[in-house]
Amino acid sequence: KNPVIHARSFGENRDKVTAYGRAYMKGMQDGGIIACSKHFPGHGDTEVDSHKALPVLPFSRERLDSLELYPFRDQIKHGVEMVMMGHLHIPALDSAVSSISYPIVTGLLRQELGFEGIIVTDALTMKGVSENMESAEIALAAYKAGVDILLKPGDIIASIDRLEAAMNSGECDIEEL
């Protein structure tokens, strides 16, 4: 169903996706390449391209745990070094877009799943996240959510200035940076 992810995935069967994903990740990392699992918390079962609009995953937490999150749990257990956040609306988890959601980035990925590696956003110019927010506010929201790398912020200078202002004002803790 997914217009963008379908051809870039290992399929629809969670066990095959998990096995192929683990083998691919292990091969990359054994070869000295940082593997990146994406698009957390699961972009496969959507019909909307997040480059153009915000996809919605209307599923229950139970469904998310049993299907979408299943391969990510396995990748984390087996030492994946990086996870890319997708721009998704998942009402069962939070009202904010997943890539700028503290409950999803820090609460679910870091605390609940125990991921200790690098978290990167998908491109912050994509309509899935940029439709209703300015570049600088998106960058700040992603940082506050717990993201380590902001991929392709729209206005880089404004984003840097906003993050710097947040650090200087105490809105964000410079020690966390």
Which residues does each predicted region cover?
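Second-shell residues forming the walls of enzyme active-site clefts
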Residues: E12-C172
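A glycine-rich phosphate/pyrophosphate-binding beta-strand-loop-alpha-helix module
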Residues: K1-G11
